[in-house]
Regions:
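N-terminal signal-anchor transmembrane alpha-helix
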Residues: 1-48, 52
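Juxtamembrane helix-loop boundaries in multi-pass membrane proteins
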Residues: 2-14, 73-90
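Alpha-helical transmembrane segments and their membrane-interface junctions
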Residues: 23-32, 91-115
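Transmembrane helix-loop junctions in multipass membrane proteins, especially transporters and channels
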Residues: 34, 63-66, 103-109, 138-142
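Generic alpha-helical transmembrane segments
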Residues: 41-63, 120-126
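Hydrophobic alpha-helical membrane segments
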Residues: 53, 78-103, 119-125
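Membrane-helix interface/capping segments
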Residues: 58-79
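Alpha-helical transmembrane segments and their immediate juxtamembrane interface regions
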Residues: 114-143
Length: 143
């Protein structure tokens, strides 16, 4: 079991090269907006890679916290619940807006951006599962 957990924790490090990819597309989007010609295709790519990145980040070992801020959140019952509710709302917003956009849009580029929102929502859903595990593993009121 420990080897499997270590394998997935190691696999979670794929998130860091993906951050560079997301940053590349994000910069393209910002530059295109500054030029008053938004690059929707780059936005779609940024959303898709961000969703994949979030998915890989959830492969980390949930029995350990990554930093002091994370530890403070997951050890506190109130802060932990607030974090879980916030992530839940984001998941719903990304999934619902993506599905509505995908199903109601007639333009192909809108469908593509909506698909990117759906992928991000699915990645965030995995993050929510990991956050629930972190909360269960670290909360102080259950020791």
């Amino acid at each position: 079991m420990k080897n499997t957990r270590q394998f997935f924790h190691f696999l979670s490090y794929v998130q860091y090269p993906l951050m560079i990819v997301v940053l590349y597309y994000y910069v393209q989007v910002i530059i295109s907006i500054a030029n008053r010609d938004p690059d929707w295709s780059a936005l779609n790519s940024a959303l898709i890679f961000l969703g994949i990145l979030v998915g890989f980040s959830t492969l980390q070992d949930t029995t350990k916290t990554q930093n002091k801020i994370s530890r403070k959140i997951w050890e506190s019952p109130i802060k932990g619940r607030i974090a879980l509710w916030t992530i839940s709302v984001l998941v719903l917003l990304f999934l619902i807006s993506g599905l509505i956009g995908f199903l109601s849009s007639r333009e192909n580029i809108h469908k593509e951006v909506s698909f990117g929102l759906i992928v991000l929502g699915i990645g965030m859903l995995g993050m929510l599962k990991g956050a629930i595990e972190m909360f269960e593993n670290h909360r102080k009121d259950r020791e």
